[in-house]
Amino acid sequence: DRLAVVDTLGRHWPRILSEGWDFYMQPRWSRCGKHVAWISWNHPNMPWDGSVLQCGQVLVDGEVLPTLENAEALDGAGDVSVFQPEFSEDGTSLYYVSDREGFGQIWNVEIETGSRKQLTFGQEEYGQPAWVQDLRTYALIHNDEKALTIVNRAGFMRVCLIDLKNGAQEDLDSLSHFGDLSHLSISPDGLRVSAIASGGALASRLIGWDCPSGELETYLVAAQAPEAKALSKAEPMTYESAGGCLAHGIYYPPVGSVPGLEGPPPLLVIVHGGPT
């Protein structure tokens, strides 16, 4: 892969901004246009194994496409993965997710000094495996004072409002009936956040959340879900596996009845083979 900039009017051939890494993802412009950040990694790693957050200074020369200089790594390594860089409103720092301390937590790094600060804690996951480009699990709102985040707790997604100044967290009850959310995106004016959401009895849908009022709106539903009484409610479970390691799973207890079936229903086991 290479990181490049393209003239949307077609006047110039695309210009390479960075090369040398096997893979690139999630490029971001700062709002002031002075910096570009991105994530890169090398084979045989996948981005959730080990990846690097980088940032470079943008140089503009008249009508010619810009170039980058002073590109440097701000976090990440062969055994540390990073995810979803987002510039602060003033462009002096970057927010991102790093699993440096085990779970993927939200961090902030100063571009000038490289000083890093962890903003969330606990045995919760604020990122997700980057299977494809531009997955998003959080959005900065209220002038970067707060973040609306998708947090994974024991395999179930919740939407949480985090005060980035003091770390205070608040689960959003209006979104608690969704067990899976993705593609979190904030409107240009910072007043609305959209996402793709679904639940144990709710088909996948496009939703919008109004930041000032907290009101939830459904824009589009992909399909009609079966009746709730016919659906099993998922339950997280943890058990000891080989070598004393903990294994995690999701259990779906039987619901309803089958005519003619005697004794307990069969237990169907599905094992996920990886790599995540």
Please state what every model-predicted region is:
Residues 262-273:
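Short beta-strand element of the alpha/beta-hydrolase
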Residues 7-10, 58-61, 110-114, 163-167, ...:
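Short loop/turn segments that connect beta-strands within beta-propeller blades
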Residues 31-32, 89-90, 142-143, 188-189:
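Residue-level detector of Asp-centered blade-edge/turn motifs that repeat once per structural unit
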Residues 15-18, 64-73, 116-123, 170-174, ...:
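Beta-propeller fold detector
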Residues 1-3, 18-24, 37-55, 73-82, ...:
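A flexible loop/linker signature enriched in serine peptidases of the S9 family
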Residues 1-3, 25-26, 120, 133-136, ...:
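Non-catalytic accessory segments flanking enzyme active sites
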Residues 28, 86, 139-140, 185:
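Conserved beta-strand position repeated across blades of beta-propeller domains
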